[in-house]
Amino acid sequence: MDLCKKSINDPLNWEMAADSLRGSHLDEVKKMVDEFRKPIVKLGGETLSVAQVASIANVDDKSNGVKVELSESARAGVKASSDWVMDSMSKGTDSYGVTAGFGATSHRRTKNGGALQKELIRFLNAGVFGNGIESFHTLPHSATRAAMLVRINTLLQGYSGIRFEILEAITKLINSNITPCLPLRGTITASGDLVPLSYIAGLLTGRPNSKAVGPNGEKLNAEEAFCVAGISGGFFELQPKEGLALVNGTAVGSAMASIVLFESNIFAVMSEVLSAIFTEVMNGKPEFTDYLTHKLKHHPGQIEAAAIMEHILDGSSYVKVAQKLHEMDPLQKPKQDRYALRTSPQWLGPQIEVIRAATKMIEREINSVNDNPLIDVSRNKALHGGNFQGTPIGVSMDNTRLALASIGKLMFAQFSELVNDYYNNGLPSNLTAGRNPSLDYGFKGAEIAMASYCSELQFLANPVTNHVQSAEQHNQDVNSLGLISARKTAKAVDILKIMSSTYLVALCQAIDLRHLEENLKSVVKNTVSQVAKRTLTMGANGELHPARFSEKELLRVVDREYLFAYADDPCSSNYPLMQKLRQVLVDQAMKNGESEKNVNSSIFQKIGAFEDELIAVLPKEVESVRAVFESGNPLIRNRITECRSYPLYRLVREELGTELLTGEKVRSPGEEIDKVFTAICNGQIIDPLLECLKSWNGAPLPIC
């Protein structure tokens, strides 16, 4: 590759960085998903993506696995740099890590380059594992596989002085699903991830303390690992510079960051769709997504978030119903929704921009050459620099973690509104669906748990990179803490998965409650109408009675009153329905004037008959419709099936087999949430999520 020609028009790489952000975030996520699912990752040194790294990391979750192929065209460049090191040493050239010692002790000199590499690996094997091959002190095997991939990609570029055969051996380990055991802790990601990477080198050189895990989870020593992987020729005797090439890089931190960012991008889209579903079940006003509002703010993340929500809500059956509700008694209702709904695009937009920028930063890092010294064969020199400094990892992971915490905070705020009957526009308190609210507390426990999750997530949002300690005799006096930050971000992702699972189950509960509400309100309205006709239309002598004019107002009461405010005992005098129905008749009687003095035309005289018949009929009708609803054959179809958000509901209810939770059943909220959590961890959420947006054209609705 001719670096001079490549950079002549963009020497500072700003144009390349800007070009990488062209197009929508959603299109980028779709591309990431496609790359994640490809069966082969082809490495050439410059085109590795975050999704491909995540794919290799998650190979255990795939039946056939993903294979790695090395570009044969890279062989010559790799060999040239390796040959240069050997030639340089034979000429007596003094080079760091080849003839000179390491770090603060680089003033030491040796002519035994191979022994120096061997000692490098030995003294860096300073990690602690505890007991077992997958203990709390062992790096997750997924991250180790990803790190191996990233390190190969770096070394393929031919600036590191290592033999191609070593890269082929690491590739065989990956393709055979053999994973070296690396310590979880012990790196400051400058000079690279020295300690964990030394254990990969230890396996390649056959160190007796090396351990690996085989395809079926079995524990392997170095010899067994080579045998299973089909690596012939015995362990590697490292040549000068090769040990340094293996350990002096940012592969572990950037690999973990890649895994984290693949999932973070999915969660960014999910948060947009869940906010739209929240709007649907809350009977929210969709005007908060109007393009002009967001165009005037200029931020692309916000504009896209609003456009995605607008797309979900456009034509939504819930929005049409909500519009009618808002037109009823408009002066008695809030003019606008609360912030968790109304400002969700403004809240999520910056988080999406942060996650997207972090993704690009890490993609540049995993395609970078980040060891020291760098071998420039074309100019016949070794360059001593600091590309091993993993600051892009530490900074991008701190930023990503803060973005994830903000997404979680919004979810918690929306969840809190959803379960609160003061705010949720007629849904029952705690989203209880049972007949007796005194014995059904719905999602109360889940809300407490959500507060716990959110608190932990907010704590994790604190930065790691401001806790740098001077290391290695003050040679590494500033260091990135990249892997530490990536590990904390991985924890944040896990918590956000739990929060998303809990929230999605609650949203599906709310969807079903709206469905139940519609079925029950229909029968209440019909029953009130029928009872009114039977008891209020005719007088004692068959004449038309003035009370008949009350029916319209009685039905308006049914429309206005929240169904779940009286559903458990619809004819209770303590509940608003009966009180307000009576008030309608009293008001009509007061207007009846002198006619009230005549027993045959008195509306007051009709109140008792109306109430008695309603008490005799309405509870039975409500219970009958509820029983039909619970049997799975409701009279009115669920509106969600007509909405673009339906694929997520279908996943939770039909594919995962969750159900409407009530205090009358044994099943707990946690059991249902666990099903969704497992599905999210397995990636089952991705296709339904993208299906919700399959018809979006990538632009907001035009301003008309």
Swiss-Prot record:
One of its GO terms (cellular component) is protein-containing complex. GO terms for biological process: cinnamic acid biosynthetic process; L-phenylalanine catabolic process. (E)-cinnamate binds at N248, Q336, R342, N372, K444, E472, N475. Its EC number is 4.3.1.24. Pathway: Phenylpropanoid metabolism; trans-cinnamate biosynthesis; trans-cinnamate from L-phenylalanine: step 1/1. GO terms for molecular function: ammonia-lyase activity; phenylalanine ammonia-lyase activity. It is found in: Cytoplasm. It is an enzyme of class 4 (lyase). Gene3D superfamilies: Fumarase/aspartase (Central domain), Fumarase/aspartase (N-terminal domain), Phenylalanine ammonia-lyase 1, domain 3. Homotetramer. This is a key enzyme of plant metabolism catalyzing the first reaction in the biosynthesis from L-phenylalanine of a wide variety of natural products based on the phenylpropane skeleton. This is Phenylalanine ammonia-lyase. It comes from Solanum lycopersicum. The gene is PAL.
